[in-house]
Amino acid sequence: MFFMKTKALFLDRDGVINIDKKYVYKIEDFEFCNGIFELCRYFLAKNYLLFIATNQSGIARGYYKESDFLKLCDYMLKEFVKQDIKIDKIYHCPHLEGCECRKPKAGMLLKAKDEFDLDMKNSIFIGDNLSDMQAGLNADIGTLILVNEEKKEGDFFKQCKNLKEILSFFKEKDI
């Protein structure tokens, strides 16, 4: 019997899911980016699993506790559920440089691959930094999208200014 591996949409948190205000850990500072819910619903309809992969060095720096981060995750997941969106899992790196999970290393992405038997070549990673793109390359993710208004150079598939532009791109390609 032949089983197809599952495709995944990986999302960075700060700058993709929420507006990046540097070290966001309080609910009152968390503001969803325009278009995130529509983008996620599109990929759910295409049978992708949804994952968040986020560096959270503010924990190691002592700016906030892991419990603060987890409380914000709980709030965020509930807001996604209100929009009929299931995030399959959140992966986070609470460390500073030097660990295997911190992007641009691929530890978080490879953990998801192993836990969910993912088809990385047919998966997508959307991030707002070149370190996200490098992590995606390191994990052999097939499609890398950089969402950033500032032109960047790097080994990524496509750069878009915002999430609505990304959604239009995928709809045009019928991905």
Task: Tell me what each language-model feature is.
Residues 27-31, 64-71, 103-104:
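Alpha-helix N-cap and loop-to-helix initiation/capping positions
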Residues 36, 40-73, 89-96, 136:
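Substrate-recognition element of Asp-dependent hydrolases with the DxDx(T/V) motif
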Residues 21, 26, 58-63, 96-100, ...:
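A short acidic, helix-capping loop that chelates divalent metal ions and anchors anionic groups
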Residues 2-3, 67, 74-89, 96-125, ...:
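Asp-based, Mg2+/Mn2+-dependent phosphohydrolase catalytic module
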Residues 8-10, 51, 124, 128:
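Hydrophobic "anchor" residues on beta-strands that sit immediately upstream
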Residues 2-49:
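Active-site neighborhood of HAD-like aspartate-dependent phosphohydrolases
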